[in-house]
């Protein structure tokens, strides 16, 4: 697991609304999302960080070998990079971003386990 994917602080944590990766707001702005930056372009853009992440999430899981873990398969993160992931993320991506993802062939499924989509 790369050191930059581990949250550097327990305050100001946010979870990506697309993949549920958890980092500090500054880490998302400085490095982007390790899994989704090709689509969400959060790196260097604090406004996109606020739009594409949520500070409201439940539970965290540290994934060292996502490809070998049954938990990562259950959480739908087995194809993602090692890191810390939220179990459930409250919120949805803005409609414009969802349309852009769809046009690029990326299916968006909410990571909020409280709502069924």
Swiss-Prot record:
InterPro entries: RPABC4/Spt4, Spt4, Spt4/RpoE2_Znf, Spt4_sf
Cellular compartments per GO CC: DSIF complex; nucleoplasm; nucleus
Disulphide-bridged cysteine pairs: none
Post-translational modification comment from the UniProt entry: Ubiquitinated by UBR5 when not assembled in the DSIF complex, leading to its degradation: UBR5 recognizes and binds a degron that is not accessible when SUPT4H1 is part of the DSIF complex.
Region span, Interaction with SUPT5H: 2-40
Subcellular localization, as worded in the UniProt entry: Nucleus
GO molecular function annotations of the record: protein heterodimerization activity; RNA polymerase II complex binding; zinc ion binding
Keyword Transcription: yes
Keywords: Acetylation, Activator, Metal-binding, Nucleus, Repressor, Transcription, Transcription regulation, Ubl conjugation, Zinc, Zinc-finger
Keyword Manganese recorded: no
Alphabetical list of CDD domains matching this protein: Spt4
A GO biological-process term: transcription elongation by RNA polymerase II
Tissue: Widely expressed.
Annotated zinc fingers (C4-type), start-end: 16-36
Positions contributing to Zn(2+) binding: 16, 19, 33, 36
Residue(s) carrying N-acetylalanine: 2
Chief place where the protein resides: nucleus
Protein family membership: Belongs to the SPT4 family.
Summary of subunit composition and partner proteins: Interacts with SUPT5H to form DSIF. DSIF interacts with the positive transcription elongation factor b complex (P-TEFb complex), which is composed of CDK9 and cyclin-T (CCNT1 or CCNT2). DSIF interacts with RNA polymerase II (Pol II); forms DNA and RNA clamps that stabilize Pol II elongation complex while maintaining the nontemplate DNA strand in the transcription bubble and nascent RNA in the exit channel. This interaction is reduced by phosphorylation of the C-terminal domain (CTD) of POLR2A by P-TEFb.
Function, as annotated: Component of the DRB sensitivity-inducing factor complex (DSIF complex), which regulates mRNA processing and transcription elongation by RNA polymerase II. DSIF positively regulates mRNA capping by stimulating the mRNA guanylyltransferase activity of RNGTT/CAP1A. DSIF also acts cooperatively with the negative elongation factor complex (NELF complex) to enhance transcriptional pausing at sites proximal to the promoter. Transcriptional pausing may facilitate the assembly of an elongation competent RNA polymerase II complex.
Protein name (record): Transcription elongation factor SPT4
Species, as recorded: Homo sapiens (Human)
Gene for this chain: SUPT4H1
């Amino acid at each position: 697991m790369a050191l930059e994917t581990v949250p550097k602080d327990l305050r100001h944590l946010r979870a990506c609304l697309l993949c549920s990766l958890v980092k500090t707001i500054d880490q998302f702005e400085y490095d982007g999302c390790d899994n989704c930056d090709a689509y969400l372009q959060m790196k260097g853009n604090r406004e996109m960080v606020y739009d594409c992440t949520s500070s409201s999430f439940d539970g965290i899981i540290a994934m060292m070998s996502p490809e070998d873990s049954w938990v990562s398969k259950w959480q739908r993160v087995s194809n993602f990079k090692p890191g810390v992931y939220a179990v459930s993320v409250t919120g949805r991506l803005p409609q414009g971003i969802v349309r852009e993802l769809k046009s690029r062939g990326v299916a968006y499924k909410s990571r909020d386990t409280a709502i069924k989509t």
